């Protein structure tokens, strides 16, 4: 069975906590975790649990079917347009940021994007 690829934009408190939870669970064998953070030392610290660091936001979207937006709301405007070209009909975007609606995320990426 092929591993499900899950990517995280942001490896701060929330993003890293979710990644550590997945890595420490029964799901860990079924999932490949990827992360990008503008502070590379944050993704480097997650290598010990098997997280693959990506070089850019766009790389996360290219690599992963599921993309968690674990960034601060004020970072959305600059970050979301960088994702648009890589989003396909199979991509699922999961936002954990307060106040960011699916409609706003679609308006900054692709109108038909799957957003939770």
PLM feature segments, named:
Residues 1-62:
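NAD(P)+-binding Rossmann beta1-loop-alpha1 motif at the extreme N-terminus of oxidoreductases
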Residues 57-69, 73-116:
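Rossmann-like NAD(P)(H) cofactor-binding subdomain of soluble oxidoreductases
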